[in-house]
């Protein structure tokens, strides 16, 4: 089997240090399945992980994947050889930048039948992130009618997470205010179903007042938490809930949350697979719901660019595009 990896952490300006490696196909044990990978999607987390310490070389990155089950471990009950599946993997295991990959069945689901592999692979990591935010942290109802009248502000609605989060929020009854800064990203947010699109490069508090937008029940920050921290506190309702997927780079005053009794949560979708939590199966269930909603026409895939072929050159170029932070939707590599 072929893998694309690297020996040491590196920045892109150091040049392309991705290399091709070969190893024997692994044999699945316990609840693992062996997947022949067809397509992968590259995420911002890949660019961050590339610069972290390598504990075992080569480091093979990659999270989103879709492929065909080739073999199953003795404890597997959910899948059979030949099933087409998708998943987001875990950073403490070999990643999907490879032709084959082992993954626990608890974080895998059968892929949608009505869209292509290159489309479906855009959804696992971002979809699970959004599902965990809405259902585990915000605790919205699975009954859309019970969420009517509640609202969410999604900061950076045109990114991979924002794109699917908007669709999920609309599917489950929320009013969605999102942000963008360019005409093409604004149009993309509207295509995803946003009710209102604001400009995040301008004063959001002022825009809320000018458009007479009420304070929101929930805020989902998918970009630069430090930059929007105080703004989010202003725009959330008393007893509201803010969740971010972006770690702080600066010290922030948590006491500022007290006056409104705001709940603040960090969402990290890899927490379940890294720690093998007792409820890890939820990721399988969330992916199943994504498949169902894709097949019913409630969600659309978020793929906007496809590279052909798994190579060091394509992977390096993908990381370059993501680090420019102007990506709309998701970037996919067809293996």
UniProtKB/Swiss-Prot annotation:
InterPro entries: ADH-like_C, ADH-like_N, ADH_Zn_typ-1, GroES-like_sf, NAD(P)-bd_dom_sf, PKS_ER, Quin_OxRdtase/zeta-crystal_CS, YIM1/Zinc_Alcohol_DH_Fams. Keywords: Metal-binding, Oxidoreductase, Zinc. Gene3D superfamilies: Medium-chain alcohol dehydrogenases, catalytic domain, NAD(P)-binding Rossmann-like Domain. One of its GO terms (molecular function) is oxidoreductase activity. Transmembrane segments: none annotated. Belongs to the zinc-containing alcohol dehydrogenase family. Quinone oxidoreductase subfamily. PANTHER family: ALCOHOL DEHYDROGENASE RELATED, RETICULON-4-INTERACTING PROTEIN 1, MITOCHONDRIAL. This is Zinc-type alcohol dehydrogenase-like protein SAV2186. It comes from Staphylococcus aureus (strain Mu50 / ATCC 700699).
